[in-house]
Amino acid sequence: MKAAVFAYSRLGCKTAERAAGYFSGYQLRMFAPQRVKQGHFSLLPPHDPDFYGQQFAWADVLLFVGSCGIAVRQIAPHVRDKRTDPAVLVMDETAAFVVPLLSGHIGGANRLAAGLAAFMGAVPVVTTATDIHGRFSVDAWAAQKGYSIGDMAAAKKVSAAILEGDVSFCSEFLIRGTLPGGVVLRNSGPVGIYVGVHTAEPFETTLRIIPPVLHLGVGCRRGISAQAIQEAVEQLLAENGLDKRAIGMVGSIQRKADEAGLLEYCKKNHFPVSFYTEQELLAVPGSFTSSEFVRSVTGVDNVCERAAMVGASRLLVRKTAKNGVTAALAAEEMEVTFG
């Protein structure tokens, strides 16, 4: 995690240095004007129009020790999307208040403001409606769990509905514990939240929350292109009604560790990839679609299904083949919790 801290006065610098302790596990940048900077501070350039944009793009958290007005003016040209914008906090130079200014839920600014306020002995000033009314914040929950939000427009409608009453909630996975305020278990209704890897929409307005619990196992012909792999996987997902964002990792046999097309596909889609030895794949328990030809070439009767099942609990989609690519999908064991 990366944090950038800005201070504008001598007292602000002292307060920022105290606040730096809260970000001790972060890559930390601290900036102040020449007239007040000291210690660990770098120069805050007075006439660089790209400076704040560069920090906005680099950091996960921006902390302005000063006024909200300063922060708003500096970040305004760079605000793009609540799914990707960093958390922006403002703390006054006396450390009396901490305000989460941007990305309160998905970026974690509300949580960070509460933590920083406790660390500094300050008061967190949280203004998001679900928080002040003690209702379920689905986008904050999804971000905390590392789940994808299917559609931000639906998320906005769900959040508005939660403020007016309870919304429906259903899941492909076992739900453990008590549901938070604002949601009730129902499989139908005008507005609802669906947690799963499929593209189902059980409600009139469905917010799909997608956990990355699918393992994609891949086997392929030597020299296969990334585009061919992309097309094979997209077809596999479409035919089985599965969401690509549910893929959490890709696996294959060790001899494919230098397969340029496979590596390019994984890089393009930001999928972590693991390669397994023949012995590791043969040790995977289960019943697989056996091929004597594949065994004669690789020493393993099935690469894609076995690779998909490493670390997973159930084989969801068996081996499919398209244009020199074989692929299978397996799912991890998962429970939905709210703690």
Question: Can you name each region flagged by the protein language model?
Answer:
Residues M1-V5:
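Extreme N-terminal starter segment of soluble prokaryotic enzymes
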Residues A7-S9:
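Glycine-rich adenosine-cofactor-binding loop
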Residues A16, A307-A308:
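Long alpha-helical scaffolds
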Residues L11-L28, A32-V36, S42-P46, Q55-A57, ...:
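Conserved mixed alpha/beta catalytic, RNA-binding, or beta-rich assembly cores of soluble enzyme
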Residues D48-D50:
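A short, well-structured juxtamembrane/interface segment
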Residues R245-A246, G251-R306, A312-L315, K319-V325, ...:
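C-terminal non-catalytic interaction/assembly regions of soluble proteins
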